[in-house]
Amino acid sequence: IIDYYDEGEEDRDVGVVDAR
């Protein structure tokens, strides 16, 4: 599942595979 969130921690677009 893909979680869309705009945290601004990683260097990728919004919508990572729950990689918090």
Swiss-Prot record:
Superkingdom as given in the UniProt entry: Eukaryota
Keyword entries, A-Z: Adaptive immunity, Blood coagulation, Coiled coil, Disulfide bond, Hemostasis, Immunity, Innate immunity, Secreted
Post-translational modification: Conversion of fibrinogen to fibrin is triggered by thrombin, which cleaves fibrinopeptides A and B from alpha and beta chains, and thus exposes the N-terminal polymerization sites responsible for the formation of the soft clot.
Transmembrane portions of the chain: none
Localization in the cell: Secreted
Region span, Disordered: 1-20
GO cellular component: extracellular region
Function: Cleaved by the protease thrombin to yield monomers which, together with fibrinogen alpha (FGA) and fibrinogen gamma (FGG), polymerize to form an insoluble fibrin matrix. Fibrin has a major function in hemostasis as one of the primary components of blood clots. In addition, functions during the early stages of wound repair to stabilize the lesion and guide cell migration during re-epithelialization. Was originally thought to be essential for platelet aggregation, based on in vitro studies using anticoagulated blood.
UniProt note: domains: A long coiled coil structure formed by 3 polypeptide chains connects the central nodule to the C-terminal domains (distal nodules). The long C-terminal ends of the alpha chains fold back, contributing a fourth strand to the coiled coil structure.
Name of the featured protein: Fibrinogen beta chain
Organism of this sequence: Felis catus
